[in-house]
């Protein structure tokens, strides 16, 4: 199957500059193509994954992906999709962000073999361009009227846009031209809001490399959820690829909670399952939605892809423990992941009567309520029901000598650590 056909059945193409030409080009040749990301933060979130998944599909089809981290463009900020001017970051912070993104992107692509990926930083070829060189060699090629008509600029004219952000499309065009000339890069991929920047790059390539220069642009539809809200956010905020910001367990849970109306679309966008495999899961969504087979598959595939098989096994173990209440077998690391959002308390490193301990920490409001809950079997320590009013809490009630998990009733959890 032609890679363009695959992207079409996955619903992953919004616009193409020359569909017929690109389709023929990828059938006849191994091409290099690129997608960029600016280091505005130290982690990608799952929304950033969308264009890079397309890049990875091209790699799987035998083409060479180029991942561009914008050490130069990141100092300015892309105005696309923004209603106001971005706050500029220090060069030191941008450099740190670049390195963090390199690590995350490095896990997504294969950097060996005939279709090996490469990673570049546009700061390397932009840092020595003087202001006079910029104006003479590049600014001269851009018509201000054309630049003003681009959606990314036109949408900001009423509230105002600085020359810095106005010139962003020139810098991105310079990137495409540089990669065309020195890396034989023929295709740029981006979100639907990048159309203006991509076409600016194609115009520059034709002016610099000749009218017959073969280069293409492809954009991806804006991904929204069935309820109309923006994809990539949960009630707690963005879902990050950095495991220190979003744990693998939280990452897994995001996908497992996907709405039935969205799950097939996400399987097409984010997994490498075949059309037949996804069709089978789609049938199960219709006939046996309670089994959530599609969601389980999506969550497993994504957690493995972004993190690892081991991270998936941990997420499954935590999920099973929380569902069953049997939490004693969890490791300290797994507890930190699974109980990240529950009320947390710090206890003295001493022995104490269970009832007093619960009240002192604030888990129970009074001794009377604590005694009642213990006597009625509503208190669990590390998954085990406690009904002994005289029980002494000691080191044996700690997991890896770090945590005690308290449950009140069926689902109310508390996490206790020690001084």
Swiss-Prot record:
ATP binds at residue 233. Transmembrane segments: none annotated. Pfam families: SYY_C-terminal, tRNA-synt_1b. Signal peptide: none annotated. A motif ('HIGH' region) lies at residues 39-48. It is found in: Cytoplasm. The keyword Nucleotidyltransferase does not apply. It catalyses: tRNA(Tyr) + L-tyrosine + ATP = L-tyrosyl-tRNA(Tyr) + AMP + diphosphate + H(+). Keywords: Aminoacyl-tRNA synthetase, ATP-binding, Cytoplasm, Ligase, Nucleotide-binding, Protein biosynthesis, RNA-binding. A motif ('KMSKS' region) lies at residues 230-234. Its EC number is 6.1.1.1. L-tyrosine binds at residues 34, 168, 172. GO terms for cellular component: cytosol. PANTHER family: TYROSINE--TRNA LIGASE, MITOCHONDRIAL, TYROSYL-TRNA SYNTHETASE. This is Tyrosine--tRNA ligase. The lineage of its organism: Bacteria, Bacillati, Bacillota, Bacilli, Bacillales. The gene is tyrS.
């Amino acid at each position: 199957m032609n890679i363009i056909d695959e992207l079409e059945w996955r619903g992953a193409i919004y616009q193409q500059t020359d569909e017929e030409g690109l389709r023929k080009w990828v059938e006849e040749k191994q091409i290099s193509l690129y997608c960029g990301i600016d280091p505005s933060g130290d982690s990608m979130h799952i929304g950033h994954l969308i264009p890079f998944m397309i890049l990875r599909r091209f790699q799987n089809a035998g083409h060479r992906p180029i991942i561009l981290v914008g050490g130069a463009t990141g100092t300015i900020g892309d105005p696309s999709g923004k209603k106001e001017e971005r706050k500029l970051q220090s060069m030191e912070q941008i450099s740190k962000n670049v390195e963090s993104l390199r690590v995350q992107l490095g896990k997504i692509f294969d950097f060996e073999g005939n279709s090996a990926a490469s990673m570049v930083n546009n700061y390397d070829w932009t840092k020595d361009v003087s202001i006079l060189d910029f104006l003479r060699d590049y600014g001269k090629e851009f018509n201000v009227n054309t630049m003003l008509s681009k959606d990314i600029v036109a949408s900001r004219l009423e509230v105002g846009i600085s020359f810095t952000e106005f010139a962003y499309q020139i810098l991105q065009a310079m990137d495409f031209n540089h990669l065309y000339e020195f890396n034989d890069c023929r295709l740029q991929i981006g979100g639907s809001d990048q159309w203006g920047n991509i076409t600016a790059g194609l115009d520059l390539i034709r002016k610099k490399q000749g009218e017959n220069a073969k280069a293409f642009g492809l954009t991806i539809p804006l991904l929204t959820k069935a309820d109309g809200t923006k994809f990539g956010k949960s009630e707690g905020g963005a879902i990050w690829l950095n495991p220190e910001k979003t744990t693998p367990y939280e990452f897994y849970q995001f996908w497992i909670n996907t709405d039935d109306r969205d799950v097939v679309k996400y399987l097409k966008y984010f997994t490498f399952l075949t059309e037949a495999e996804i069709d089978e899961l789609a049938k199960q969504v219709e006939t046996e939605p309670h089994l959530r087979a599609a969601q389980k598959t999506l969550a497993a595939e994504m957690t493995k892809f972004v993190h690892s098989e081991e991270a998936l096994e941990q997420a499954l173990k935590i999920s099973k423990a929380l569902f069953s209440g049997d939490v004693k077998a969890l490791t300290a690391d797994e507890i930190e992941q699974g109980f990240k959002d529950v009320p947390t308390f710090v206890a003295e490193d001493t022995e104490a009567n269970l009832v007093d301990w619960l009240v002192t920490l604030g888990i129970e409001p009074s001794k009377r309520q604590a005694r009642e809950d213990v006597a009625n079997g509503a208190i669990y320590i590390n998954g085990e029901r406690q009904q002994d009013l005289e029980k002494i809490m000691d080191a044996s009630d700690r997991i890896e000598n770090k945590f005690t998990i308290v449950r009140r009733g069926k689902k109310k959890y508390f996490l206790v650590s020690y001084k």
